[in-house]
Every structure is written in C-alpha cells, then in structure tokens.
Design a protein with these regions (language model features):
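Formylglycine-dependent sulfatase
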Residues: 2-5, 19-188
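Bacterial N-terminal signal peptides
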Residues: 6-18
Length: 188
C-alpha cells in the first residue's frame, strides 16, 4: 500500500500541474462601466434598460455585496488592478500618478505567469506612473479571440458611455422622467 501511495504522490507531483482544468483557470471578463451605482436591470432597477448586462449577470457572476474604495474612475481602477486600498499606496486622489513599490504588480502580470492571455481594451489610466507589462495586447483592437486555442484569458473591455465626462455633452435629451427615478437615501 505504501508503494502505491508513494507512486501516486510522485506521479501527482511530477505531472499534477499538467492536469489543470478549465475550472481551475476560468476565463475572466472585466467590463468597466464607470461613475454610476447599481442602476441596472440585473440589480432590480425597473427603469434601467440594460439587456446585455442583465444577460451576462444571469449567466455569469453577479456581485451583490460590493462597494468602491474610490469614488472616481482612475483611483477605482487602481484599486481593482492592484488589489490595494488607495490610501495605502497614495492613489486615492484623481491624477495622483503614484510610484508603486516594486512588489506591487498589476494582477494581469500574475495571470500571464499562470498561462493566461491578457487583453486591455483600452484604458491605460490606472492613476500610477508605471505602465504594466502584464498585457499581451492593450489597444482599442485588443481581444481575447487572438489567444492560442484553449488558452485561458483575462479580458478588460472599457465602456465610456457612463463615464463622468459624458454627462456634460450638450445638448442632451432626457431619457427618463426624473419624477420616476428613485433617489438613494444617502443623497440629500
């Protein structure tokens, strides 16, 4: 029995890393939609018309308990891409452009070391001075479809339609009746 166990242990140690399944390396899609709250159909907003996001939420993962560590786009992206609380690295203010300590890497760097194909389409403003080398592609044409067959991927797609800079485009038409919009209790 101990010889069988020893053989099994040696086999797992020698070949175990090649037995990775898709569940252990799931594909990851990060869709950035900035500067808004949970006003989407998948979160129960009856006025929101968000059929594509709703379909993704139904088939994928929907976070029901989340918050932003930063109230504006670039510092929030810094938090997500580094996993760091913004004040802990000096990135809490818009346009902080901090120098990250060498031991803090963007997580696509780690994912690439694990065999992932990493794409960024296409915001590169992470509120830090360094640019990551964690991408296989980073442009408005970057896409996970360019990876090797069977290779797991991490893909960021950035939507700009909800970005704060878009709310000042004039003239604009009212899409909803303001009287029907639910104002969260934390607003005055």
């Amino acid at each position: 029995m101990s010889k069988l166990f020893s053989f099994a242990l040696v086999w797992v140690l020698a070949f175990g890393s090649s037995l990775v399944t898709a569940a252990e390396h799931p594909n990851i899609v990060w869709i950035t939609s900035e500067d808004h709250g949970p006003e989407m159909g998948c979160y129960g907003d009856k006025l929101a018309v968000t059929p594509n996001v709703d379909a993704l939420a139904k088939k994928g993962m929907l976070f029901n308990l989340g918050w932003s560590c930063a109230p504006v786009c670039a510092p929030a992206r810094t938090t997500i891409i580094t996993g760091m609380y913004p004040p802990s690295i000096g990135g809490q203010h818009m346009r902080s452009m901090v120098n990250l300590p060498a031991q803090i890497q963007f997580y696509p760097t780690f994912l690439r070391s694990q065999g992932y194909y990493c794409t960024n389409n296409s915001k590169t403003d992470y509120n830090v001075n360094q640019q990551t080398t964690g991408w296989n592609e980073s442009s408005n044409k970057a896409h996970y479809r360019n990876r090797e067959k069977g290779q797991p991927f991490f893909a960021i797609f950035n939507s700009t339609i909800s970005h704060e800079s878009k709310i000042r485009v004039r003239p604009h038409e009212k899409v909803l009746d303001p009287a029907k919009v639910r104002v969260p209790a934390y607003h005055p």
